[in-house]
Amino acid sequence: MATTKSFLILFFMILATTSSTCAKLEKMVTVLSIDGGGIKGIIPAIILEFLEGQLQEVDNNKDARLADYFDVIGGTSTGGLLTAMITTPNENNRPFAAAKDIVPFYFEHGPHIFNYSGSIIGPMYDGKYLLQVLQEKLGETRVHQALTEVAISSFDIKTNKPVIFTKSNLAKSPELDAKMYDICYSTAAAPIYFPPHYFITHTSNGDIYEFNLVDGGVATVGDPALLSLSVATRLAQEDPAFSSIKSLDYKQMLLLSLGTGTNSEFDKTYTAQEAAKWGPLRWMLAIQQMTNAASSYMTDYYISTVFQARHSQNNYLRVQENALTGTTTEMDDASEANMELLVQVGETLLKKPVSKDSPETYEEALKRFAKLLSDRKKLRANKASY
């Protein structure tokens, strides 16, 4: 009798724990963030292809897409382009691009996008081909049509303020319901590289609203993870299904942040003696590299510290290559040879350990994330069916 009683107590304890875990997983907000970095977007594209493949395998569904699993997908610069590709609907209201289509997109269009304009007074590239291909691929689709919440950053040089394009903010700011191709060009219009982008939308009163935008990296300095988390928090607070989530409650966030690679630990370091001889132009190029590397590091440091403080370190995964060398460090080298190298970087990165203190590889960590994303999606689907 005592044995039976003990068994029943243990059974109900396990049942209660399982129910609690399922409830927490069901209410978890899932976030994908993709850095900027020009042609180096090939690196996170490789990671996205692997993750989407894992989701298709876990759910036994070849039509599974990343937008089906993430509440918020955010990106800046080339990361904004990737965000649009995997969230913009086609005629069947499914993402117009699968993750496996992204790398071929770079190979086909990258050499034309980064085709030197020959101008000595304007930007290095005229941006005409980039805008043309974005118009062809994204059509007349606007922000409100995105298949999940998006967070794509840009910076308005006329108002001197960041501009964040999200679905959830359209009720308050309908002028932000811009065409996706305008948004994508704007977030990629890096100073020095591409011309700023001007376009108009309309306010709720029908008045013209002007945008004068440049690269989202000016606003988020390359890593939009904090921006994406902020949008996810606001989204959660406005959705009754997530009413239990408090502001920036990272215990109920699942964040995957994808970098485009840095060289901060290896190549292109400088001495004070070298820098003392630089002119303004040399400083401009170096500062951009330094700022991007430093910002990426500090954003990762802050987020990982907060997740650890909340005992939720397994809810955050930063996938980043810190050992880029040679041509792979350049955001505009779209030669076939360099793009092949970037593919190799991404594929090799999957086999590397997440940290020096953990034997878990990025590949294993992404498989773990895929299982969590799949389980959470199934829990929500089951609840919705009742």
UniProtKB/Swiss-Prot annotation:
Short motif (DGA/G): ranges: 215-217
Location relative to the cell: Vacuole
Active site: 77, 215
GO molecular function terms listed in the Swiss-Prot or TrEMBL record: monoacylglycerol lipase activity; nutrient reservoir activity; phospholipase activity
Pfam families from the UniProt entry: Patatin (PF01734)
Residue ranges the record marks as coiled coil: 321-384
Domain annotation PNPLA: ranges: 32-229
Superkingdom of this protein's organism: Eukaryota
Keyword Ribosomal protein: no
Placement of sequence motif GXSXG: 75-79
Tissue: Tuber.
EC main group: hydrolase
InterPro entries assigned: Acyl_Trfase/lysoPLipase (IPR016035), PNPLA_dom (IPR002641)
Keywords from the UniProt entry: Coiled coil, Glycoprotein, Hydrolase, Lipid degradation, Lipid metabolism, Plant defense, Signal, Storage protein, Vacuole
Family: Belongs to the patatin family.
Domain comment quoted from the record: The nitrogen atoms of the two glycine residues in the GGXR motif define the oxyanion hole, and stabilize the oxyanion that forms during the nucleophilic attack by the catalytic serine during substrate cleavage.
Other notes: Patatin have a dual role as a somatic storage protein and as an enzyme involved in host resistance.
Functional description taken from the UniProt entry: Probable lipolytic acyl hydrolase (LAH), an activity which is thought to be involved in the response of tubers to pathogens.
UniProt xrefs under PANTHER family: PATATIN GROUP D-2 (PTHR32176:SF85), XYLOSE ISOMERASE (PTHR32176)
Name listed for the protein in its UniProt record: Patatin group M-2
Taxonomic lineage: Eukaryota, Viridiplantae, Streptophyta, Embryophyta, Tracheophyta
